[in-house]
Amino acid sequence: MSVFAVVPVKELRGAKSRLGAVLDPVGRAGLTLHMLRRVVPALRGAGLRRVLVVSPDPAVLEEARLLGAAGLRQEGFGLNAALEEGRRRALEEGAGALLALPADLPLIEPADVAALLEVAGEGPCAVISPDDARSGTNALLLRPPGALPFSFGPGSFGVHLQAALRRGVRVRVCERPNVAFDLDSPEDLARLEASGGVQYRPRRA
């Protein structure tokens, strides 16, 4: 199975705005790149053939290339638009399956990615990995790549489940603590730092 990954990343100057109370813009940009340096190696370490990082930011695309991923300049606006652009490129390059996930998963490891692939089994399917609150979607594996529309955002776990049921797509839920934890708020950052799970020490606001 030729599995491609698509990782959307916002422009650095606007990244992680919810952390503005505790991190200055340089700190937020640095944290975003730090997490990308975790996500891409996790994907490559699990043996994915191709990793596409989609972003409007040239600095992000350059970092992606340094990590061994392909950089795709985002033309549209928003998370789901970035994922659609990545899906189109993946299909052009012959992807048999697509793994979509955000870049703000600071604990993800190759074993987590491998678990998603294992749960998929054989044949057409959708594997959904929710966030801690079981509200959002933190990873979505689709085989074939066009099996479902992308609906990432608040409440997307349920939206993706319902879309799979409506379309008759076999669906599996894969809950992994390292995938469920995404870094969005000051509380998330404090939790991560307290756990010792991040070595990066960003500049404070």
From Swiss-Prot:
EC no.? 2.7.7.105
Which reactions is this enzyme annotated as catalysing? phosphoenolpyruvate + GTP + H(+) = enolpyruvoyl-2-diphospho-5'-guanosine + diphosphate
Q: Which Pfam families match?
A: CofC
Enzyme class, top EC level, equals: transferase
Instruction: Say yes or no: keyword GTP-binding present.
Output: yes
PANTHER family, A to Z: 2-PHOSPHO-L-LACTATE GUANYLYLTRANSFERASE
Q: What does this chain do?
A: Guanylyltransferase that catalyzes the activation of phosphoenolpyruvate (PEP) as enolpyruvoyl-2-diphospho-5'-guanosine, via the condensation of PEP with GTP. It is involved in the biosynthesis of coenzyme F420, a hydride carrier cofactor.
Protein name (Swiss-Prot/TrEMBL): Phosphoenolpyruvate guanylyltransferase
